[in-house]
UniProtKB/Swiss-Prot annotation:
Its main location: nucleus. InterPro entries: GINS_A, GINS_bundle-like_dom_sf, GINS_Psf3, GINS_Psf3_sf, PSF3_N. The keyword Repressor does not apply. Keywords: DNA replication, Nucleus. Pfam families: PSF3_N, Sld5. One of its GO terms (biological process) is mitotic DNA replication initiation. Residues 177-209 are annotated as: Disordered. Coiled coil: none annotated. Belongs to the GINS3/PSF3 family. It is found in: Nucleus. The GINS complex plays an essential role in the initiation of DNA replication. This is DNA replication complex GINS protein PSF3.
Length: 249
């Protein structure tokens, strides 16, 4: 991750719920009340990059620093805002992770779930969440490796498989703004996306039932990966492909 890393910028722009600990003049526009103050205990969502700063900086400590920059820092009072637990880390999601991490649709919960989790863990030094996310990634990485190692792009079927997967990902991206029933909602129509992409690519008529079934199963799983996992799949797939090419020489 770096300053110009697009994924990191998108992660920091993810909105998280906050509660204001003070009444602050002139910020009413944040809740569509221009010219009005934002009231104490008001709850709204702010991008992570802003909420993180406001949750660390305390109003009293800032005033003390302005009056005497050399003064030793004391308790400092409350921070400007209190970060509330996002839906993506709610008990419902955590329980789903513990129950069956492989079937969880991380992309539907948040396309940058794992990157957000790392930032949240670092912010609160949350060891419990860290262990849960570690087990989640370990379980899913093994399955990602299985799918990445079983696909060959050196055959006609492999090329059509890749084409069908890309079509499914594009269809998923186009439907990303559709309503969902909450953070645990899976992407409705994943199976239909797979079938439609397979039909468009000609897989259904050119390969056996077993290969078509494998395509459907693997595509359903890959559509549930968040952006970090998709990059992991791509890197793993390319590594296996290059190794097979080298061995076949």
């Amino acid at each position: 991750m770096g300053y110009y890393d697009i994924d990191d910028i998108l992660v920091d722009s993810t909105e998280v719920p906050c509660k204001f600990n003070y009444e602050i003049p002139g910020l009413g526009y944040l809740e569509n009340n221009p010219g009005k103050p934002i009231r104490k205990n008001t709850k709204l969502s702010l991008p992570l990059w802003l909420a993180r700063v406001l949750a660390i900086v305390g109003a009293d400590s800032q005033e003390q620093e302005d009056m005497d920059p050399n003064a030793e820092e004391e308790d400092g009072g409350d921070a400007f805002v209190e970060l509330l637990t996002p839906d993506m880390f709610s008990n419902k999601v955590i329980n789903a992770i513990k129950t069956d991490p492989k079937s969880l649709d991380l992309h539907a919960i948040n396309p940058y779930f794992l990157d957000m989790a790392l930032k949240w863990i670092a912010l609160y030094s949350d060891k419990d969440l860290g262990e849960i996310v570690y087990e989640l990634l370990l379980e899913r990485a093994q399955q990602i490796n299985n799918y990445a190692s079983s696909v060959s792009i050196d055959t006609e079927y492999g090329n059509k498989y890749r084409s069908a997967l890309l079509d499914a990902l594009r269809l998923q991206q186009n439907s990303a703004n559709e309503d969902r029933s909450g953070p645990l909602a899976s992407i409705n129509g994943t199976s239909s996306l797979t079938t439609r992409s397979a039909n468009n690519s000609g897989i259904g008529s050119s390969v056996g039932t077993s290969q078509a079934t494998n395509l459907a199963a693997s595509t359903r799983f890959l559509l549930k990966l968040d952006e970090f996992e998709r990059q992991l799949y791509k890197d793993t797939h390319d590594s296996y492909r290059d190794t097979k090419k080298w061995v076949s020489k």
